[in-house]
C-alpha cells in the first residue's frame, strides 16, 4: 500500500481560560490502560442517559471526556508535527532506524515542554509514521476526530454523502448483520474498524459505514422511516418519549427511497449545546467521522460560520469555489421536524405528534438545566473545562434545521 498523508489540526482553548483545560487526573484517566488514549474513545459513548442528563462529577456530560481527550491530545501532539529526537550517551537520532545519527557538540539540556494549541499536524513530518503504519493508523483516527471537533465552536463537524448509484449488494449483505444494533453500538463498530489497520476508501466496510451514516442522518431528519427506507434500512426511534437517544437499525420490505438526482454530500453540526448530553448526536458524529478518517473529506469546509481560529487552514478550510458551508441544526427543532414527517407519512397521529413534541421539549429542558448548572460549577477561570462553554441563548438557536431536513429529502427522494 502506498504511503498516505494525513493532515490534521489541534484544538484551541478559550482565550479567557488559562491553559491547559485539564489536570493531572485527566492525563492519568486516559493513560491508565494499554493502547490509551488511542482506540479507547469508544468507551466514552457507551453511557446511556435514558433521558436523565447525568454522568459523573468529573465528566458531567456524554461529550465531556471526548472534549478533555481532544484537548490533551492536541496540546501534546507537537511531536506529530515536528518529529522526535532521541538522545543517549552523547548521540542524537530520529526514528527506529536512527536517521540523522550524530554526536552533538555538547549535551544539550532537555527542551522545555510547552503544551501547544491550534497546531497544524502533518504526518509527512513524523518520522515514525512510515515505519509504524499500523500503529499510526489508530493515532490518525483519533487525531482526525479531534480535528473535526477542533474546527467547530458548536457541535463536531461531520460529513454525509449519498451517491446516485444503488446500494451495492455486498453493502446490503453487510448491513443485514447489523439489524437490531443501536446507533451507539454501530458507532463503536465503525470506530474500531477505522482504527485497527490501514483501510481503503473503496473497501466494502468503508462503503457500508458511509451508507450507515447516511441512513442515520435521513432517519434523524424523519425523512427515512419504515415506510420510506434506504434499500429496506432505517433507524427506528422505538422510545421517542422515554429515551429519545435510543435508535436501532431495522429493515422493512416496503417503499424505498429512489437514488438522488445527483450525488449529494454536505457537512453538518449541532448549533445548540444540547448535543453535549445526547448520546445519539455524539455517536452519529463519530460514526461519520470514522468514514472520513479512512476515505478523506470530499471537499474542504467553507470559512462561513466557522470560528476565526478554524478559518483558512490549509487542506481543511477556506473560501474558494468548491468548499462546503457547514449547516447547523437544533436537536429540538429537528425532533419536531422528525415527528412532523412521521405524522405526514401516517406513522403517528397528530395527537401523538403533539405528545412527542412535548416530551422531547421536556427532555431538552432537563439537559439545559443540567448543562447550565455544570457550567456554573466549572467556571472558565478554574483552568479546567469538562464541558464546552456556551451562552444561555444558544439553547434556542434554531440554526438551519429546515434546510438540513430539505437536504435529507434531496438525498432520499
From Swiss-Prot:
<dbReference type="GO" id="GO:0039626">
    <property type="term" value="C:viral intermediate capsid"/>
</dbReference>
<dbReference type="Pfam" id="PF03084">
    <property type="entry name" value="Sigma_1_2"/>
</dbReference>
<dbReference type="InterPro" id="IPR004317">
    <property type="entry name" value="Sigma_1_2_reovir"/>
</dbReference>
<protein>
    <recommendedName>
        <fullName>Clamp protein VP6</fullName>
    </recommendedName>
</protein>
<keyword id="KW-0946">Virion</keyword>
<comment type="similarity">
    <text>Belongs to the reoviridae clamp protein family.</text>
</comment>
<comment type="function">
    <text>Located at the interface of the incomplete T=13 outer capsid and the pseudo T=2 inner capsid, 120 VP6 subunits clamp and stabilize the inner capsid shell.</text>
</comment>
<comment type="subunit">
    <text>Interacts with capsid proteins VP3, VP4 and VP7.</text>
</comment>
<keyword id="KW-0167">Capsid protein</keyword>
<keyword id="KW-1154">Intermediate capsid protein</keyword>
